[in-house]
Amino acid sequence: MRKVSLLFAGTFLLLGLSKTSYGQASATANVSATIIAPIAITKTNDMNFGRAAATAAAGTVVLTPAGTRSFTGGVTLPSFGGTGDVSPAIFTVSGAPNYTYSITLPTTATTIENGANTMTVDTWTSDPTPTGTLATDGTETLRVGATLHVGANQAPGLYTSATPFTVTVNYN
């Protein structure tokens, strides 16, 4: 009887030493992801400085993103015969509605040519700058202006770029 009592006592002792944890809890969670429309940029209109007259002194024509022009040095902007088709470069940026994006303009000059005659375009500006926000329809108009450098006694003619300039947009 004593052996049975010791056996029961030992069993209860071992049972008392076993640990049952009541301090644990578990939960689950779902996973999701949203893919937004990729950002895109499309040219709507090429840049055009319009008509300018060169003199014996070099100068510049500044075209703002709003499409207004000013001049410095020996360049004049004739009022007779019209100004020509003056326009900043216009792009449509599209993507996810209400998202912001950064704008990267060229950092180097672009050369425009008329045969062997050349001029350079640089000092790029944009509206908006340096970031834009897409509207609720996912689009925004981006306008780019620049400065045209006209040489002294620049040869008359239509000057165009052989290589277009690049504007880059990226989501912020």
Name the predicted role of every residue range.
Residues 103-111:
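Short acidic, flexible loop segments centered on an aromatic residue
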Residues 14-22:
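C-terminal segment of classical bacterial N-terminal signal peptides
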Residues 42, 110-120:
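Short aromatic-acidic-glycine turn motif
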